[in-house]
Amino acid sequence: MTTPVLNTDFPGLKLAARGKVRDIYDLGETLLIVTTDRISAFDVIMNEGIPHKGYVLTQISAYWFRQMEDIIKNHIISTDVTDFPKECQPYADVLAGRSMWVKKAKPLAAECIVRGYISGSGWKDYQKTGAICGIKLPEGLKESDRLPQPIFTPSTKAELGTHDENISFEEMCRICGTEISTKVRDVTLAIYEKARDLADQKGIIIADTKFEYGIYDGELIIIDECMTPDSSRFWPKESYKPGGPQPSFDKQFLRDYLETLDWGKTAPAPPLPEEIVRKTGEKYMEALVKLTGKGI
């Protein structure tokens, strides 16, 4: 099995942040985002990485960013390492395929979730209240049902190791401003509807997904990642059957395994068997091939 990239360390480059998955380097006016093979579940980073996961996430993000350029600009300057600043070139072998050279935008203080199907925390909220983020939904929905129309459900941005919290659109307006929040909502729904239709043609249901936006030169742009298996629920269309959880092309396979363990869902993470690592990697790679027609 290929050795996963768990951490990066590039002498001469300034490490600005190390998130659950990405290492971000400050290049002055721009940023270098390196997507590692780290994987987290229940907000805990696992000890093992998933080989090629960083490559898969980067390539899927780049694919969707290109597809959505008619709706909104994105933060990418280039994903081709030969275009990167000269101080990055000594590390080209590690960076190739798993990194983006991006504009330095000011992130909005909310994460923007769109749901086309009812699942996960949305399903739990609906069972309790008949609504998600204050949006009333029809009675009688089953788990994994397609919603009558997609809904925009923002959340707070949590610190590493803590959980995001769903908020109402009105609360987002108070945090970010009404004008920008309205634009973000409209753009998010437009992106989702276009992506949902494109993915459907390739046998994938995008049940829900999460976006981040920023302001660059006074303009709203989309940043971070775009509709990857880490930020979305991807279901195989061929086996879709409402009324319960769905198989998926993401880390749900890992979550399901962890649910079988006597583990409190706090660090330290339990060790992962090689089979779980391998099968999780296969799920990610299958999503890349189905969406883009290309593997490694």
Curated annotation (Swiss-Prot):
Q: Which InterPro entries match?
A: SAICAR_synt/ADE2_N (IPR028923), SAICAR_synth (IPR001636)
The transmembrane residues are none
* Metabolic or biological pathway, per its Swiss-Prot or TrEMBL entry: Purine metabolism; IMP biosynthesis via de novo pathway; 5-amino-1-(5-phospho-D-ribosyl)imidazole-4-carboxamide from 5-amino-1-(5-phospho-D-ribosyl)imidazole-4-carboxylate: step 1/2
Q: Per the UniProt record, which EC number(s) apply here?
A: 6.3.2.6
UniProt entry keywords in alphabetical sequence? ATP-binding, Ligase, Nucleotide-binding, Purine biosynthesis
- SUPFAM superfamilies on file: SAICAR synthase-like (SSF56104)
One biological process term in Gene Ontology? 'de novo' IMP biosynthetic process
Q: Kindly name one Pfam family recorded for this protein.
A: SAICAR_synt
Q: Which reaction does it catalyse?
A: 5-amino-1-(5-phospho-D-ribosyl)imidazole-4-carboxylate + L-aspartate + ATP = (2S)-2-[5-amino-1-(5-phospho-beta-D-ribosyl)imidazole-4-carboxamido]succinate + ADP + phosphate + 2 H(+)
Query: Where, if anywhere, are coiled coils annotated?
Result: none
Question: Cellular component per GO?
Answer: cytoplasm
Q: Which family does it belong to?
A: Belongs to the SAICAR synthetase family.
The entry's protein name is Phosphoribosylaminoimidazole-succinocarboxamide synthase
* Organism encoding this protein: Citrifermentans bemidjiense (strain ATCC BAA-1014 / DSM 16622 / JCM 12645 / Bem) (Geobacter bemidjiensis)
